[in-house]
Amino acid sequence: MIRYLMCILLLLSVVISGCGKTDKITETAAETQNYTVHDIRGKKITFAKKPERIASSFVYADEILLDLVDHQKIVGLSKWVHDPGLSMGHKQAEDVPGIVENNLESVIALKPDLFFIADTAKKEYIDSLEDAGIKVYVFKYISRLDEIPDLVKGIGEAVGEKEKAETLIKTMNIKINAVKTKVAAIPQKQRKTGMLFLRFGAIGGAGCIYNDILSTAGIEDCYQQARPA
C-alpha cells in the first residue's frame, strides 16, 4: 500500500521515472546480535539475533518487510499484499505463500519469532499473542504521508536492518522532493482540482494520507466539497 500511494503521487505529478520495485538493497554480511527495540507502546523487545520467522498482519508493514529482509525469513503476510489493486508489492510477495488471517490460531500456526501488528488491534488480541510466546511489535497505524519514514525506521530496527531502512527512507524522500520541485514550477492558475477513487469509492479530506498525496502533487483535494450535504 505504501508503494501504491507513492506511485499515485508520482503519477499525479507526471514524474516519469520509477515507482515500481525498489532497487534491491545489497545484503550486509554481518548479522546484528543482541539488540533491543521499543515499539509504539514503549514495550522493550530484545533479540539475541535477527528474527528468522517474521509475520505481519498489515499491508503497510508487509511491503516494507518485502524490501528489508530475505523472503525466506517471512513466514506470513496479510492477504491484502497479494491484491494488485491495493499493493504494488503483490509480485514480490508471490514467494511468500503464508497468509496471516485475522485470528489468533492463524498467527500461532506460523510460529513466528516476530510479529508486526498495527496499534488498531485490540489489546486482548495482542496480549494473547504474547502469552503464546510470540514477540509482538506494535506499530502506529499511519494516516499521514510524513509518518511513513518512522514506520520504515521502526520496522527496520526491529528486524535488524537499520541501514536498509535508512536507504529506503532516503529513496522515498528523493522521490517526494522531485515531486515538490516539479510542482513548484507549475503556476497556481494551472493547478488542478481532483479527488482519489479506490474501488470502494472516493477517499480524501483534511488530515488524511490521500489528501497529503494530492497536496504534495499540487492538486487541490475536492473530496469535502463533493460529499453530499
Range-by-range predicted roles:
Residues 7-15:
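Bacterial N-terminal signal peptides
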Residues 18-62, 163-194:
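Bacterial Sec-exported substrate-binding components of ABC uptake systems
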Residues 34, 124-202, 223-225:
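Extracytoplasmic substrate-binding proteins
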Residues 53-119, 219-222:
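A short, structured surface patch at a secondary-structure boundary
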Residues 60-64, 80-83, 114-115, 120-124, ...:
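Solvent-exposed loop/turn segments at secondary-structure junctions
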Residues 104-108, 126, 211:
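Short hydrophobic/charged patches on amphipathic alpha-helices used for structural packing
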